[in-house]
Amino acid sequence: MVFSQRLPEYILPFISLSSPTNTPANPDSFPNSQHYRTDPKDLCLVITIIAVYAILRDALRLGVFEPFARWKLSRDIKLQRKQHTGTSNGNASVFGNGNGNSNPKFMLTKADRRKIHRSVLRFAEQGWSVVYYTLQWGFGLYVYSNLPTRVLDPVDAWIGYPHVALAAPVKIYYLTELAFYLHQMLILNAEARRKDHVQMMTHHIVTVFLMWASYYYNLTRIGCLVMLLMDLCDIFLPLAKMLRYLNLPQIYPDLTFGTFMLTWFVTRHVLFPIAIKSTIFDMRRLIPFDWDPERGYYHTLGSHTMFYLCLLALEVMQMIWFAMIVRVAWKVVTGEGATDVRSDEEGEDEDDSGDIKNKQE
C-alpha cells in the first residue's frame, strides 16, 4: 500500500485492480475478499498482463522448453546410432573416443539438426499453452467453486442480477483470461498462417466479445462457468503434441489425445449446451428487461439475443472442430497415430530443406 501511494496516479491502473468498492452486506461468495466494480481503466491492467504473458512465453520457450527438447532429441538420435553400430566393434561411444573428441559416427548431420530444430520449435510453442491452461483452469476451478452456481443447473447464475460488486479473484480471473485471448490474437497474426486461421480468429473475436460484454454487463457468473468449461480440454491437446514431438512411444500421445477428445466432448458438447440453454430460457425468465446503467442493468431483448447467438456460434464452430477430432480418433483406431487436423503442421510432409516455421496451437 505504501509503495502504491508513492507511484504516480496514472501508473496505478496498469499494476493494480481499479475501482474498489464496499463489500456487499451479505455476500454469497468470497466474503473476506476486497470487492471491485468494472471500470474502463481495467483495460490498462489487461495491457500489462499481455506484456507479462509475452515475457513469460518467451522465457519458458527459450529458457526451458527449447533447451530440454533439443537435449532430449539430440541424445535420442545419438543413442539410437550407438545401439545400431556399437555391437559391431564392442567399444563405440556416443560421448567420445577417449581423446576428448566426439565420435564422428554419432555426430548430428545437417538433416538431423533441421529435423530437431523443427520439433524443438513446435514443442516449445505447445509448452506455453500447457503451462497457461493448467494454471488458469486450476484458478478458474477455485473461483467457480466459491460461486453459488452449479454446472449441471446454472440457474443460480442469474439470481441476484446485477452482480455489480466483483470479488478480487473473479475480477483477476476475467482480466487474465481476456488478456490471454488478446495475446493469442496477436500471435495468430504475427506468425505463419495455419489452415484454420480464419476459424481460429473468428473464434477468438467472438470469445473476446463475449468476455467483454459479460464483464461490463454484469453477467460474470455465467461467464466464469463458460471459461472454466472451455479451458479444460485445451490442456491435453498441446500436451499430446509435445509428447509426439519428443518421439515418445505412440501410446502416450494417443492416450493423451483420447483424454483431450473425452474432455472436449463432455465440456463443449454436453455441459456447454446446458449453459446455452440456461442463457436462452432462465436468463429471460429470471431477469426482467431493463436498461439502467446507473443500477447495473443491461438486459434488453437485443442484448439477450446477442448473448445466446454468440454462444450458439461458438458451439457451431466447436462442432465443426469436433468432426475433425473424430477423424483423428479414427486414425488412432486404425493404427495411424494421432495428429492434429485443426492446424497446419508445416513441414510435416516437407523435405527437410524446407522452411522451418513457428506454429502456435
Label the predicted regions.
Residues 1-218, 244-248, 253-264, 272-313, ...:
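Membrane-helix and juxtamembrane interface regions of eukaryotic multi-pass membrane proteins
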Residues 204, 268, 318:
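Short, conserved phosphate/pyrophosphate- and ester-handling motifs at nucleotide-, phospho-/glycolipid
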Residues 210, 223, 237-239, 255-256:
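Extended hydrophobic/aromatic segments used for targeting, binding, or gating
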Residues 215-227:
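Transmembrane alpha-helix entry/boundary detector in multi-pass membrane proteins
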Residues 227-231, 260-265:
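Transmembrane helix-bundle signature of multi-pass membrane transporters/permeases
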Residues 229-240:
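Alpha-helical transmembrane segments and their membrane-interface exit regions
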Residues 232, 268, 322:
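Hydrophobic, well-ordered secondary-structure elements that form the walls
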